[in-house]
Amino acid sequence: MQTTLEFIPVQEQHVEQIVDIYNYYVLHTTVSFHTEPLTLEEMRAQLFDLPAHYCSYAIIERMDELDTDEQLAVASDAAYESSLLGYILLTRHKAKQAYDTTAEITIYLKPDQAGKGIGSRALVFIEQAAQQHGFHVLVATVCADNTSSIRLFERYGYEKCAHFREVGRKFDQWLDIVSYQKMIGRREGVDG
């Protein structure tokens, strides 16, 4: 049996699992600067209340090439229904119109899915989606302690463009954030 990774627009049935993933990072890490868990309603707003060219995707694992007995076993296995591995967002970088060709990237995975290459595949996918939506620049802002995300963005050509010192406080410690950016679109009038 093989599995494939799919990126599909987030749907209502994904929201509960997505809020669980996000709230793990809220409660146990400095990856998120929220200090209180989000409610389902708050997460729905983040996922669905987006201007048209911003979007959210669920990262889904699907099983392939099953024989009939395996298909029956999978269909009755409640664990299979939980095939959502994480989610990706393209959101507004800033709320002013001149920023409309720039998007901020967010990638969250279930904690047990880190280090498996899923984040890399998600980043490649979201860059392609961003190009199709006409974005020129992608920005990723992460806690400076989040070295795995920093390595991911650097590996894919993102350049550090900002470092803000001690702008957050969580778990009784001051936290820095760093921003990375990547030009993905053509510059009208410059690139032809």
Locate each region found by the language model:
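Helix-loop element at the rim of GNAT/NAT acetyltransferase active sites that forms part
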Residues: D20-P37, D49-L50
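Conserved catalytic-core motifs of GNAT/GCN5-like acyltransferases
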Residues: L89-R92, Q97, V139-V142, E154, ...
